[in-house]
């Protein structure tokens, strides 16, 4: 069963807020901007992560230095799963944040 529009927006909002909270609590020097449903994380080295919602197909998209990734929400797992690699969003963010900033952060709740 496909996510309802309201459920999709609630999930993306909660995910983006969790990402913001993790970066806020990390002490890492980042700029966070959340505007019109797009969350941008800018690292002090100029690289960035961009989280956007694709409402018509109910996906969360992540743009990073290493590429673009599309995530579907798995209700059974309660996680966002990459549609090309089956990697969980939290696992991918650990790897990408390390690659782009050199910092090891935990994204277990994602």
Swiss-Prot record:
PROSITE patterns: FRATAXIN_1 (PS01344), FRATAXIN_2 (PS50810). One of its GO terms (biological process) is iron-sulfur cluster assembly. Keywords: Iron, Metal-binding. One of its GO terms (molecular function) is ferrous iron binding. One of its GO terms (cellular component) is cytosol. Signal peptide: none annotated. It comes from the Bacteria. InterPro entries: CyaY (IPR047584), Frataxin/CyaY (IPR002908), Frataxin/CyaY_sf (IPR036524), Frataxin_CS (IPR020895). Involved in iron-sulfur (Fe-S) cluster assembly. May act as a regulator of Fe-S biogenesis. Belongs to the frataxin family. This is Iron-sulfur cluster assembly protein CyaY. The lineage of its organism: Bacteria, Pseudomonadati, Pseudomonadota, Gammaproteobacteria, Pseudomonadales. The gene is cyaY.
